Each structure stands twice: as structure tokens, then as C-alpha cells.
Curated annotation (Swiss-Prot):
Endonuclease that specifically degrades the RNA of RNA-DNA hybrids. Mg(2+) 2 binds at residues 13, 137. Its main location: cytoplasm. It is an enzyme of class 3 (hydrolase). The lineage of its organism: Bacteria, Pseudomonadati, Pseudomonadota, Alphaproteobacteria, Rickettsiales. Its cofactor is Mg(2+). It comes from Ehrlichia chaffeensis (strain ATCC CRL-10679 / Arkansas). Its EC number is 3.1.26.4. GO terms for biological process: DNA replication, removal of RNA primer. The gene is rnhA. This is Ribonuclease H. Residues 4-145 form the RNase H type-1 domain. GO terms for cellular component: cytoplasm. CDD domains: RNase_HI_prokaryote_like (cd09278).
Amino acid sequence: MKDELNKVVIYTDGACSGNPGPGGWAAVLLFDDNEKTICGNDSDTTNNRMELTAVIEALKLLKVAYNVDLYTDSVYVKDGITLWIRKWKVNGWKTANKMPVKNLELWLELDSLANFHKVTWYWVRAHVGDLYNQKADMLARSQIVR
């Protein structure tokens, strides 16, 4: 039962210089009394791709199903996975404007991972003093290779 799963809190962020351009992503995972950070980069990407990658890489670290509280400052990620994705599936992965969904391969991977875990999604305002959001932001920006 998914209610009996172990719990993890995750904060993610992505950053990009140029958009498109070099980018970085990061996640802070909080397990009970333990904290783990992960981060990475891409030489030619977009901010949205980095935001998605941060969430995907964090969820991929979890080898068994977890109850996940996931905090992102990306409306694109939160609304995409909680609202838009259902409509995209019904519309053959087309947007409301009948255009192909951007970053489709990332959305497909995120959808699969999110369905494996029990994820509760939260949007957090960026740059207002949330400790772990700031940590993820700092790590993501540190990964940008100019």
C-alpha cells in the first residue's frame, strides 16, 4: 500500500544561461535525518529541460516506491505533471494549440516515475528564503559551464 511507504522530501531546481544555452540542475533529498544532494549539467539546453531533469534524476535515485513531497519553483513542471499531462495524453501529446508537446521524452519519463511513487507536488516561490529551495538553486547555478 502506498500509504505505508517510506517518506522523502525533495526540492529541485534548474537553471540556464541563455535559454537555450548551458544549464544546470540540482535536487536536495531529505530522508529522516539524512540529506543528499545531486546535480548535473548540459552544455546546450533550456531552463524547462533542466527543471524537468532535476525532478527526474531525483526520482530515479529512489529504487523502491516512496511517499514523496516534491517542491519545485517551476510552474511549468508542477502544472505540467498535475494538470496538463492528462489533456496531452487525451490529445495525442498535443497542446491545447494542437502543437506537439515540448520535451516529450522528459514528460514521458517523469510520468512513469511519478506513477511509481506516491508524489505530492508543491510549488514554492523562488528566492524568498526557503532554505532547501535556495540550496537547490545555488547548486543548479553552480553547474552551469560557461
